Amino acid sequence: MSAKLYDETNPISIENYAQKLIGKTFNDVLNDYTKYESELLISEEKEEYAENHENKKRKGGLGDLIEECYFHYKCNNDSRPDFPDAGVELKVTPYKINKNKTLSAKERLIITMIDYFKVVEENFEDSHLWNKSQLILLIYYLYSKDIKNRL
C-alpha cells in the first residue's frame, strides 16, 4: 500500500485531504482507489465491494467506503476516534432536500454506542463519547430517492 496522502496525527492535514472529496461521487472514490491500490482489490472483488457498499439497506456502507478507499484504513468498532492520533472522528451522513426546498438530515447521526448500565458510573469528561465527539469531521452527501445507485 502506498504512503498516505495526509498526516494521520494532524487534524488540519486530515481536513485538507477530506476537502479533496468535494465534487466527487462515491464511485469516483472507488475507481481512484482501485486504480492506485490494485494490489488490495482485484476486479472481481471491486464489483462485489461496490455492490456491497451500494446496498441501500446497509447503513454505514458509504462511510466504510470513504474510510477504506479514501482514507486507507480498515473499518472497526473501536470506541476511540477514527484517527486516534489526531483525536478526529469521521462521520459520513446523508442530507435531503425537502419538498419546501429546505435541507434536513435524512437520518439520525450516531456517534457511538453507549452501555446504559455503565454510563451512570462514568464521568462525562472521561467517557469514550466525549473522547470521540470532541473533534468530528462530518462528510455529508445528497440523498435523493430518484438516484438508484448510491455510488
Which role does the model predict for each range below?
Residues M1-P84, E89-L151:
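Nucleic-acid endonuclease domains
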